[in-house]
Amino acid sequence: MPEYLSVSTLTKYLKMKFERDPYLERVYLTGQVSNFRRRPNHQYFSLKDEKAVIQVTIWSGVYQKLGFELEEGMKINVIGRVQLYEPSGSYSIIIEKAEPDGIGALAIQFEQLKKKLGEEGLFQDKFKQALPQFPKKIGVVTSPSGAVIRDIITTVSRRFPGVEIVLYPTKVQGDGAAAQVADHIRLANERSVLDVLIIGRGGGSIEDLWAFNEEKTVRAIFESRIPVISSVGHETDTTLADFVADHRAATPTAAAELATPVTKLDLLGHLQQQENRMSRAISNRLSYYRERLNKLTQSVIFRQPERLYDGHLQKLDQLNLRLKQKIREYYSEEQQRVKILQHRLEALNPLSRVQHLQEQTAQLERLLRSNMAVIYDNKVAQVRRLSEALLMLDTSRIVARGYAIVQKNQKVIESSAGIEEKDELTLLMRDGQLEVEVKHVQRKEI
């Protein structure tokens, strides 16, 4: 009679066979990721091909070391072991190592991190900083023994001697390289003495260049307040540092040229051009003012300054005539008024009233004559003052008494306000004029 086994007994037997079978202790599988959903710790999903599906498990410690993110539909190669789960009688693969099929894990990680940081906006042009034209200090984050620093020093010294180069000696590949690169970028920003920062290294494999693809390096470059030039690998190599840096150079020499956009020879040539332009401008300005001066010295007003007040004299004569006419009119009107009063007095027959009115009339006449005399004297004095004021405008009389008329830009200067040192002034004198330059200005408080 056959012996019947319990389900658990059979399951334990099968588990023992799985665990002791040398072919199942370490299995190599290739398949497509299915039913994947990112979990906080351990990852559970399926691997499938056209004919079968198998459950797989990745413990959290292993998953964190993969170096890339699993995605639904991704084809991967895995190394693991078979495990049977007794309560359900199902088996699965416990993955110990995995990598994308056909393309390296670093390449996948590169694309995934590039996509992530790109979506955050780290590579946008609006964040790129311009390079200064005349840097005084250039920082270099690279290996102290490589050709990169030698090429940069040689190129900068040739293009613009005197620019100081500050080296931040850094490990550029291997464990801890990315952290050191990021730390030195932040250190350079904390000191705030650099105008430009170059980060770079020579060529190599993607593994050799990986320190410049790690997220900590990329974020340190993005956060840098100092403009960063990336010069990593050869011209055909591309790193995430190239995308986030403000400028990218194919070689260390090209990076040094970007950092010193204006050479010493360029600057000397520019200064010579400016000097020539200034000389031409000064010469043209002198010719212009010399021509204006010649025209002024030949003008009628300059040769016959009395014409300056001819119009004022004519106006003074007109005012004098108008004043005399007004006085005559006023006197005539008052005489007429007196006559009217006399007629009225004669019409009033009483002698006392006539006498009173005659006395009043005489008094008014005396007052009128007195007022007329005062008015006349005032008008004559006013005419005399106007005449004297007009004579004071005669520049020939002013300079004849030993004074000089000061002009700036053909305008008469009445105060030291507005006059500065090195201003050019013109002094008009009795027998000529002087062109002078102000050496010192001493103002008096009024």
From Swiss-Prot:
UniProt-listed NCBIfam families: xseA
CDD domains membership: ExoVII_LU_OBF
Protein name: Exodeoxyribonuclease 7 large subunit
Function: Bidirectionally degrades single-stranded DNA into large acid-insoluble oligonucleotides, which are then degraded further into small acid-soluble oligonucleotides.
Record's keyword terms, sorted: Cytoplasm, Exonuclease, Hydrolase, Nuclease
GO cellular component, one term: cytoplasm
Species of origin: Streptococcus sanguinis (strain SK36)
Swiss-Prot/TrEMBL catalytic activity: Exonucleolytic cleavage in either 5'- to 3'- or 3'- to 5'-direction to yield nucleoside 5'-phosphates
The protein's Enzyme Commission number: 3.1.11.6
Record carries keyword Isomerase: no
Biological process terms in GO annotation: DNA catabolic process
InterPro entries linked to this entry: Exonuc_VII_L, Exonuc_VII_lsu_C, OB-fold_nuc-bd_dom
Gene Ontology MF terms: exodeoxyribonuclease VII activity; nucleic acid binding
Keyword Magnesium: no
Recorded coiled-coil stretches: none
Subcellular location: Cytoplasm
Assembly and interaction partners: Heterooligomer composed of large and small subunits.
Family of this protein: Belongs to the XseA family.
Pfam (any one): tRNA_anti_2
